[in-house]
Curated annotation (Swiss-Prot):
Reactions mediated catalytically: oxaloacetate + phosphate = phosphoenolpyruvate + hydrogencarbonate
Name this polypeptide is given: Phosphoenolpyruvate carboxylase
Enzyme Commission number(s): 4.1.1.31
Gene Ontology MF terms in the entry: magnesium ion binding; phosphoenolpyruvate carboxylase activity
GO biological process, one term: carbon fixation
Lineage: Bacteria, Bacillati, Cyanobacteriota, Cyanophyceae, Synechococcales
Pfam families linked to this entry: PEPcase
Any one GO CC term of the record: cytosol
Top-level taxon of the source organism: Bacteria
Family to which the UniProt record says this protein belongs: Belongs to the PEPCase type 1 family.
Residue runs in coiled coils: none
HAMAP family: PEPcase_type1
Residues annotated as the enzyme's active site: 175, 630
Signal peptide: none
Amino acid sequence: MESFQQIKNNKVDLISTNDPLDKNRLLIEDLWESVLREECPDDQAERLIQLKELSYSKQIEGDSSKTFKKEIVDIVNSMDLAESIAAARAFSLYFQLVNILEQRVEEDRYIQSFTNKNVQKSPDNLDPFAPALARQNAPVTFRELFYRLRKLNVPPGKLEELLQEMDIRLVFTAHPTEIVRHTIRHKQTRVANLLKKIQVEQFLTKEEKNFLKIQLKEEVRLWWRTDELHQFKPSVLDEVDYALHYFQQVLFNAMPQLRGRIAEALTENYPDVQLPSQSFCNFGSWVGSDRDGNPSVTPEITWRTACYQRQLMLERYITATSHLRDQLSVSMQWSQVSSSLLESLETDRVKFPAIYEARATRYRSEPYRLKLSYILEKLRLTQERNNLLADNGWKFDLEGELNTKNIDKVENLYYKSVNEFTYDLELIKNSLISTDLTCEAVNTLLTQVHIFGFSLASLDIRQESTRHSDAIQELTKYLDLSVQYDQMSEDEKIKWLVDELNTKRPLIPSDVKWTNTTEETFSVFKMVKRLQQEFGSRICHAYVISMSHSASDLLEVLLLAKEMGLLDQNSKNSNLLVVPLFETVEDLKRAPEVMEKLFKLDFYKSLLPKVGESFKPLQELMLGYSDSNKDSGFVSSNWEIHRAQIALQNLASRNNILLRLFHGRGGSVGRGGGPAYQAILAQPSGTLKGRIKITEQGEVLASKYSLPELALYNLETVTTAVIQNSLVNNRLDATPEWNQLMSRLAETSRSHYRKLVYENPDLLNFFQEVTPIEEISKLQISSRPARRKKGAKDLSSLRAIPWVFGWTQSRFLLPSWFGVGTALSSELNSDPQQIELLRVLHQRWPFFRMLISKVEMTLSKVDLEVAKYYVDTLGSEENKDSFDDIFEVISKEYSLTKSLVLEITGKNKLLESDRDLKSSVSLRNKTIIPLGFLQVSLLRRLRDQTRQPPISEFLIDKDESRRAYSRSELLRGALLTINGIAAGMRNTG
């Protein structure tokens, strides 16, 4: 069995086999075609295969683009509904297989870069980072990084100081457009693992390889017969389960390896530098705790999420401890043990007589096994307690319940904190060391405990600012203040809030029935208090205020925290870190002014947590990429975030405050996404200082964390970029001429973007008619609504994620580039010589290079011929003229932007300098075309029926009298095309 099915293969001429990626694509092509031939009727399978080859080969042969696309349109329009659904599923499967393959190739390249001891060197008189920069999207490894830092004469002491202070936090989020079912993700992982085995062909016999191919084909056929669409709207706890999958399957084991790799690289280049014992990379989560615009996230849900996370960690620790007990068979007949360990065994014997009776005979001369038996029992008791808490909710008084029922308390038997578990493991480790023994499994488990604790990830609470001000307004109305809260000026609000924060008497009466919304707001703070009592402050410490506009927004949250016991006035200690999220461009501009007001309040500064050896106060601030981009366009959003970081860091330094910037990046370029290495290096010099917090959106989790080496690649990429940015100061961000140029570009691009998006009265109708935005809202893919306000249909209520999603599906990708060309053109029209300055910026300034790189990548994915088909076919007749005008504006801006980007980069074609990315995008751009036309065909038929409600649910299509079909079937077909295009574009929103 040389291939999945012996067929004539004419794709060899289409794909170069010199590259590993191209070579393996042939395997995927063969697999895909073989599955279609077995799962579809013969004529249908051949038609689908020909359709894909037509979309690919015709462009390569140089046929007129419009002519060959018309051929595809004719084929698509001739399909009945069953064929259309089969086509949507087939192309979706194809792209998902290609995605798996590309991830596997990325994984292999990372393994090669890690195992390659020969660091790519640059001449002594050049920038040691030049080879890395030349590769653009190829990050350096730990080994490369430390070698280059040594060449730059970075002192060991400076590096060690940074490592001591380094604090990287990656925050997983649920995603309103996470398109792939959890069930399908599992199948993708199995396919990836089988591909990995097949690709080591030099170690396989012909029979072994053929057997693996049979297994691979079986898995994909099972996948084909699995429903791709969610059958019900996922609950928040479903989303929690989805996010926890990556911790359970990948990250739990990957994190100790990451630490091992950085330690090995330090030993080679900086042998005197000690890696600190604490974790430099930690995880957070919004899944189950982000309640902004999601009424499904209740206090009860957040409580159960915390219990689920602890349950997962306890399960992993029980498994690891059981393996340790099998391994640590050291006998006292042949080895000493520490006196501390022996003393602990005696203490445990008294506490756990049943365990002693059951295990003492078997392990009487094996002290480590006996100790680990006691540890296992403590973990199981902790697990039992956790299950009780999860089942009964956050208001459940466990201790009171036990007392009432006269049940003996399990006092001192379960682990009350992770520190007790750590102490037991340290006893074992130190006893081994005292007798000249080591056990890597013990060290690995200790590393995992240091990183994950019992909490797994910190849960950030997020809520929109008006929820707090509305609650306080209701409170002040009840208290009958002389001036109601909503009538106060900002200065009056600050004074009243600070006075109340300094008052020890309670403000909120306990016996009042509040409105449901206010009661919910108060309950969140009560639940957080209970969470911290049970789990410790690590489980839930940060409270993010979305749409922060003013200093009072933060003080309101502190006041509510004080009322619920989260703030100790005597010790000036707050158990809640209040984090403002500045989202719009105007709010980003005002952010330094807002924070300066707060830093001038001694009371506020005293509440900030003190961190590090310096024991300085720490302020965390979040910067929103999504809404600022939707509000003002790509250039303006990125520039204002860049400027805000510099201004905020300068402000913090003047006030002797440490700053941790939290970047709310999305998966797509229109929401701050893109290569992490480039993005972090592009942060203003001096703003990181080893500290960064970044959202990891639900839609990109699979591409970053589905495979072990992929996860390590991403984690090493982020860590090396943070170290490089913090230690290698390029000082280019302070160049006045460059800053002035960027400010002009930002203002011009913002003006042009807003003229189209917010000032053109027809744009909203255009977006709703020519993109599948309304159908996207019918996908059962998220617990969160697509709009902030129920029933609202204006742009302001639409979330940034579906905004980007709709433009991506229709191949405009408008939020990621519109306005750039006009801004650049305006600059060059005033002074043509500025092109040289722009080229210098692209070559030397990481921020500008990142900006142009993202625009270039996005432009390469745009297909205006396909987009025009959406406009012509889906646009209503009454809007034809205005829609044509809008498309003309978009088309001109695209051409202008593309030509000027190429002029700046000095290339003839987009992505010319990144062969791998260009190859991937080219394959997708060509093969995805039928899906776009298919989506338009299905949307047109679906909307025609919606506009003219039929007497019966079942109809005969006016274009195809072959069979009856239902409106729900049409919707299903349309949703399947959304799945396929999302897979082909490799992102949604």
